């Protein structure tokens, strides 16, 4: 229980190649570099969404495949929970914002109790204006992080939360990190929050652009009938 956790390996790349090109080779390299025996792992933590539809499908399919092959449980970490855990030990309200376009963000509202993440409001897709109103009701300092920061920082500072104490995470803590997902995975594993590989499904929070366009097309066709 009091054992100090250690990150053995973490592989991060934020460049042009796609998840489908990089994920399996990265996993393979980590296994080789650490001489890991896959049978010794207890569970597989996976960032289960929201996020890029393709990225989520690839990540979930990979975790599912490993879980089935190794007969190990999965720990589904909501992507914004994992992001929030980057800021462990802060005394501010933590608000990850991922750009969901159309003035919306994928977000959640959190605070830390020591090294334990507390979810004040679970992950959701909301307009940035509505999120700012929610945060103002807490009356506490807030720190934002995530790829929605460059998109919405100006409005948050100059329009939506001018009278509130807000801050923004530095670049090295501003993106999803495998180590944070892993550490939060340990907390959720101890709390019994696991699922079987068969049960796991990515959480998109809303339909993909392709599905939206299809629905709009069908509506238009019905109108013309």
What kind of region is each of these model predictions?
Residues 1-3, 7-12, 134, 207-210, ...:
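Patatin-like phospholipase
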Residues 6, 73-175, 209, 221:
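Surface "functional belts" at beta-alpha junctions
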Residues 32-39, 68-77, 193:
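Phosphate-handling active-site elements
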Residues 1-48:
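N-terminal beta-alpha supersecondary unit
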Residues 46-74:
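DPxDG-like acidic metal-binding loop motif
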Residues 1, 106-110, 203:
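Conserved hydrophobic/aromatic positions in well-ordered beta-strands
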Residues 167-225:
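Acyltransferase
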């Amino acid at each position: 229980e009091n054992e100090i956790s250690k990150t053995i390996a973490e592989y991060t790349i934020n460049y042009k190649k796609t998840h489908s090109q990089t994920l399996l080779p990265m996993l393979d390299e980590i296994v080789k570099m650490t001489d890991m025996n896959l049978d010794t792992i207890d569970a597989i933590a996976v960032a289960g969404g929201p996020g890029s539809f393709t990225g989520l499908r690839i990540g979930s399919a990979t975790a599912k495949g490993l879980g089935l092959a190794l007969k190990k449980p999965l720990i589904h970490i909501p992507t914004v929970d994992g992001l929030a855990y980057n800021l462990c030990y802060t005394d501010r309200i933590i608000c990850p914002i991922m750009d969901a376009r159309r003035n919306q963000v994928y977000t959640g509202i959190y605070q830390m109790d020591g090294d334990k993440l507390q979810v004040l409001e679970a992950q959701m897709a909301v307009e940035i204006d509505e999120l700012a109103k929610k945060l103002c009701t807490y009356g506490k300092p807030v720190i934002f992080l995530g790829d929605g920061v460059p998109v919405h920082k100006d409005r948050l500072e100059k329009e939506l939360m001018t009278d509130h104490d807000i801050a923004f995470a530095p670049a090295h803590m501003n993106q999803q990190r495998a180590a944070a997902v892993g550490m939060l995975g340990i907390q959720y594993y101890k709390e019994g929050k696991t699922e079987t590989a068969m049960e796991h499904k990515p959480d998109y929070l809303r339909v993909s652009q392709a599905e939206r366009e299809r629905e709009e097309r069908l509506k238009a066709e019905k109108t013309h009938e």
